[in-house]
């Protein structure tokens, strides 16, 4: 019902815009301004249009390396257009910029307005660097699918020729495209193939209201927020490292049932002293970008959860460090002598449970499931990645990456912020 209402509103808006252009004396003109950017150009030129009581129908401006590109589409009358063009030309010459005029036919304008009801998508590409080959490949697929690129912008900061400092290099470009793809699934598949072939990450999202107001984000912990599997660390100290690591790898690839593998691995930890957990927690290797990601999410009011097949003890360490709101993981049973019993307490947090918890937290926080994000790397993360409004596979196993709608493999986990439309200029380092 809501989407039907939006469609009605779009059609009504399009009708109103075309009704504005009804007088045979009306004239629509597109002016394109280019040159060295300086303060006051936009103000001066729109000031002239204002003097002649012109109606602005569309406007767009960008600045690349101090070079201005400004476009203004406006409506006036036949009797005034000549005088307006003269004044604009004089002012542009005075300010040292170039100006070109293009008259727009009324029918062409009406057709342009009618296209605004089409679907819109956001395509985000990111990596350590973005190459012309990558952009050519992505834009080629966009064209093959019958989509039109409306806008391209850089979300990352300006890129130095020689990278210096301790901050990892990253680059992100966002495309806004319009239209109805011929085959959306095929387009998504081709994007993923290219990302593997050319070494970059790509995201395709519908540009709807939910994309701009996501409120809950749920993370896997092991090999996602931290660069290790805690159960493997415990196993090494228990002297069963190779055996447990093999079971872990098989489970994360989806080759064996998570519950079965978890029970077997925990049993092998029997007799390990609980003090070992603190030793591991004190040296947890934090994934690149976690600090920056958490700062940005907390500043913008996100609720943050850890939904992990690992252990509550380590999840709570991250909770205290970053102000995470919820932690759901597995609890190891410890006997009166401070030794692990080889058993766990309560229900296992497996893939099914992660998806259930995601839905439950959305209800608790009173947000639509479309406003949720899930990030994980293993096969047991797939249910929550599919259930969330935005599911992101992070440095994932091949099976997970093939299935996930979005993935990040080339940069840190703070790349999630670019999929949400964040710009570097919004985020303090």
Residue ranges and their predicted role:
Residues 5:
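Cationic, low-complexity basic patches in intrinsically disordered or flexible, solvent-exposed regions
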Residues 14, 18-214:
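A conserved regulatory-domain signal marking ACT and ACT-like small-molecule sensing domains
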Residues 41, 134, 225-228, 312, ...:
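Short glycine/serine/threonine-rich phosphate/pyrophosphate-binding segments
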Residues 105-117, 206-215, 248-274, 330:
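Long, charged amphipathic helices and adjacent flexible linkers at domain junctions
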Residues 209-259:
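Active-site neighborhood of HAD-like aspartate-dependent phosphohydrolases
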Residues 271-429:
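C-terminal cap/substrate-recognition subdomain and adjoining C-terminal extension
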């Amino acid at each position: 019902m809501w989407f039907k209402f939006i469609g009605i509103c779009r059609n009504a808006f399009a009708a109103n815009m075309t009704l504005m252009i009804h007088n045979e004396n009306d004239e629509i003109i597109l002016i394109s301004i280019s040159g060295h950017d300086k303060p006051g150009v936009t103000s001066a030129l729109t000031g002239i249009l204002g003097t002649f009581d012109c109606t602005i129908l569309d406007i767009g401006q960008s600045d690349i390396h101090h070079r201005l590109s400004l476009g203004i589409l406006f409506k006036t009358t036949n009797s005034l257009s000549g005088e307006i063009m003269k004044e604009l030309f004089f002012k542009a010459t005075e300010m040292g910029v170039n100006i070109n005029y293009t008259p727009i036919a009324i029918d062409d304008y009406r057709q342009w307005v009618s296209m605004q009801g089409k679907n819109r998508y956001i395509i985000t590409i990111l990596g350590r660097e973005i190459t012309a080959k990558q952009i050519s490949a992505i834009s080629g697929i966009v064209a093959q699918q019958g989509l039109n690129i409306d806008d391209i912008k850089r979300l990352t900061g300006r890129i130095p020729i020689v990278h210096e400092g301790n901050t990892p290099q990253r680059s992100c470009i966002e495309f806004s495209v319009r239209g109805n793809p011929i085959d959306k699934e095929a387009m998504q598949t081709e994007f993923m193939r290219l990302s593997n072939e050319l070494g970059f990450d790509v995201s395709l999202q519908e540009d709807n209201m939910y994309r701009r107001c996501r409120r809950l984000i749920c993370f896997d912990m092991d090999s996602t927020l931290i660069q290790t599997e805690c159960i493997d660390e415990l196993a090494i100290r228990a002297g069963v490292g190779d055996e447990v690591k093999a079971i872990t790898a098989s489970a994360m690839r989806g080759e064996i049932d998570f519950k079965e593998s978890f029970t077997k691995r925990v049993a092998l930890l029997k007799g390990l002293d609980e003090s070992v957990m603190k030793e591991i927690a004190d040296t947890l290797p934090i994934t690149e970008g976690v600090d920056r990601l958490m700062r940005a999410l907390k500043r913008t009011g996100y609720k943050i959860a850890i939904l992990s097949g690992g252990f509550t003890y380590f999840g709570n360490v991250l909770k205290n460090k970053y102000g995470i709101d919820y932690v759901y993981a597995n609890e190891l049973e410890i006997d009166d002598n401070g030794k692990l019993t080889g058993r766990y307490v309560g229900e296992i947090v497996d893939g099914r449970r992660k998806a259930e918890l995601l839905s439950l937290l959305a209800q608790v926080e009173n947000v639509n499931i479309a406003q949720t994000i899930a990030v994980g790397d293993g096969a047991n993360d797939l249910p929550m990645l599919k259930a969330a409004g935005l599911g992101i596979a992070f440095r994932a196993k091949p099976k997970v990456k093939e299935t996930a709608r979005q993935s990040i493999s080339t940069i840190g986990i703070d790349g999630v912020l670019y999929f949400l439309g964040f710009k570097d200029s919004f985020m303090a380092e």
